[in-house]
UniProtKB/Swiss-Prot annotation:
CDD domains: RNase_PH_bact (cd11362). Phosphate binds at R86, G124, T125, R126. The lineage of its organism: Bacteria, Pseudomonadati, Pseudomonadota, Gammaproteobacteria, Enterobacterales. One of its GO terms (molecular function) is tRNA binding. InterPro entries: ExoRNase_PH_dom1, ExoRNase_PH_dom2, ExoRNase_PH_dom2_sf, PNPase/RNase_PH_dom_sf, Ribosomal_Su5_D2-typ_SF, RNase_PH, RNase_PH_bac-type, RNase_PH_CS. It catalyses: tRNA(n+1) + phosphate = tRNA(n) + a ribonucleoside 5'-diphosphate. It comes from the Bacteria. Homohexameric ring arranged as a trimer of dimers. Keywords: Nucleotidyltransferase, RNA-binding, rRNA processing, Transferase, tRNA processing, tRNA-binding. This is Ribonuclease PH. Belongs to the RNase PH family. The keyword Cytoplasm does not apply. One of its GO terms (biological process) is rRNA processing. The gene is rph.
């Protein structure tokens, strides 16, 4: 039996609180059960050097965990003097995922930075970051249009992500930490609103998984992500 008696295909209780901070062009507190991530979108004029003069924008991301977002305190990476490999991998994933949602040519020479700070971790922090940052990004783009800095909204559609895995032989959606740590197979799936895949990251931690199990996990992820899309739309319409 899963924690909180969730069904195998069920996403944890999901909340997206917009305008959570007052300074950023977009800010969202996203909560998947006990996982809580603050996602902010910052708009700046100009682009990285490698894009100058090309008439297109850029979307990048940074990810971090508060020292006591986990069971025991982890030192800040700033205190260590460098970011860890996991952090770099996750923030690149967030940036890639959100760039897929935007027509960078229509964005013009603006850079949008998505900062995802984990306040409390209970599994699925990278997928929660993507789903929350998408809403923060949508708010930031809407403000660019409303201010007259952009003629049309360059957002092509929503992006959401969820974790799936096989735990004790059963395929489960949106893994909590206790499930993730015991999973035989762990997978993160990122999708566009139209159903196309942006990224699939899957690893067999113990027993290798079959082709049929892979397809079952992707179907499970699709259903969970559809629930997240509905929550994103409801938040943006509120």
């Amino acid at each position: 039996m899963r924690p909180a008696d969730r069904a195998a295909q069920q996403v944890r209780p999901l909340t997206l609180t917009r305008n959570y901070t007052k300074h950023a062009e977009g800010s969202v507190l996203v909560e998947f059960g006990d996982t809580k991530v603050l996602c902010t979108a910052t708009v700046e004029e100009g682009v990285p050097r490698f894009l100058k003069g090309q008439g297109q924008g850029w979307i990048t991301a940074e990810y971090g965990m508060l020292p006591r977002s986990t069971h025991s305190r982890n030192a800040r990476e700033a205190a260590k003097g460098k970011q860890g490999g996991r952090t770099l991998e996750i923030q690149r994933l967030i940036a890639r995922s959100l760039r897929a949602a935007v027509d960078l040519k229509k964005l013009g020479e603006f850079t949008i930075t998505l900062d995802c700070d984990v306040l409390q971790a209970d599994g699925g922090t990278r997928t929660a970051s993507i789903s929350g940052a998408c809403v923060a990004l949508a708010d930031a783009l809407n403000k660019l249009v409303a201010s007259g800095k952009l003629k049309a909204n360059p957002m092509k559609g929503l992006v959401a992500a969820v974790s799936v895995g096989i735990v004790k032989g059963e395929a489960l959606c949106d893994l909590e930490y206790v499930e993730d740590s015991a999973a035989e197979t762990d997978m993160n799936v990122v999708m566009m609103e139209d159903g196309r895949m942006i990224e699939v990251q899957g690893t067999a931690e113990g027993e290798p998984f079959s082709h049929e199990e892979l397809l079952a996990l992707l179907d499970l992820a699709r259903g969970g992500i559809e629930t997240i899309f509905q929550a994103q739309k409801a938040a943006l319409e509120s």
